[in-house]
Amino acid sequence: MIFRDKEIFMLIPQRPPIVMVDVVWSADEQSADTGLTIQEDNIFVKDGLFREPGLIEHIAQSAAAFAGYGTFVRGEEPKLGFIGEIKDCVFNLMPPVGSELRTHTQLVTEIGGIRLINAEVRLKDELVATCVMKFFLKDD
């Protein structure tokens, strides 16, 4: 199932202007493939380029999308998540406005509500960024 535009809000708790995922190509309990088309008015664009904080937020929201997919299939609202650790981030390039990013996030492990994920951000065939992120989801 593909989620676009406002359908994204069924998977992530973020709302404009901080939404950094505009399409979810696929998602399950283990991984997600997401996308973002970088607009000129994006708050993380400077001098025509999408900067590192935006890439990190995009990765975090991509991870939230696959966590949100689990709540979606159970008929629940997406949970608020908090980043606990970011490590091994490599930024190979800063994508320009108009770029269509495609990101794959993969669950490595989950223990007690804490998730560890690997992420790869691509622009066509170019590897834009990689990152390992640990986050936890707030229980209601």
Model-found features: residue ranges?
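Short aromatic-glycine motifs in intrinsically disordered, low-complexity regions
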Residues: D5-R15
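Conserved positions in beta-strands of structured domains
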Residues: D22-W25, K87, N92, Q106-V108, ...
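Active-site helix/loop of acyl-thioester processing domains in fatty-acid/polyketide metabolism
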Residues: V24, R51-G75
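HotDog/MaoC-like acyl-thioester-processing domains
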Residues: A65, P96-S99, V108-D140
